[in-house]
Amino acid sequence: VGSEMCIRDSLHSGSIFANEQGIKVIDPEFAFYGPMGYDIGNVIGNLFFAWANKAYTGGSAETQTALEQTIRETCDKTAEKLAAEYDKLVTFPLYCASAFRKAYLDGVMADSYGYAGTEIIRRVVGDSKVIEVTSVTDPAQRLPMERALIDLGIYLIKNRAGGLNGAAVTEEFRKILA
């Protein structure tokens, strides 16, 4: 894990505003220089809260499918865009070598999935909970939802370096939900 960019810390869906003109991120006072996988992981991790909430509170199958697709596409398009930007911006010959490029980009995505797992667990068991969890007041719904999220967090942490992608992480969460 290296210091690769200025990251937001605590980045989540509530701090991102997007429209046709661009994207804005609020609360920059939390920013620091660190691994880009941290912010990417926070975004990925936070997307699972909406899906878990709908899965345990009777959300429609259509909504759950849309959330699953959003997560899968976010993971995969992030990896694709990172690779495209790398190819566009990196010019130093050693860093352009295919083995180095692959190791670096795989490392960023491994960090991202690992941080997604820690973000999920932190938001379930820590002091900074999310509304998708706290709004579920029925213990018969909330406890299994929290367990599913923790299980996913553990999976992401343990398997972060195993070449995960959007299909793998959404398939795993479907298995956990079953």
Model-based region annotation:
Residues 1-8, 19, 134-137:
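ATP-dependent phospho-/nucleotidyl transfer catalytic cores
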Residues 10-16:
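Catalytic-loop signature of eukaryotic-like protein kinases
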Residues 16, 33-35, 52:
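Conserved protein kinase catalytic core
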Residues 27-31:
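Activation of the activation-loop gatekeeper triad in protein kinase-fold domains
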Residues 37-90, 116-133:
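Active-site activation/catalytic loop segments of kinase-like enzymes and analogous catalytic loops
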Residues 94-96:
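Long, amphipathic alpha-helical stalk/connector segments used for oligomerization, subunit docking
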Residues 99-178:
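ATP/Mg2+ or Mg2+-diphosphate-binding catalytic cores
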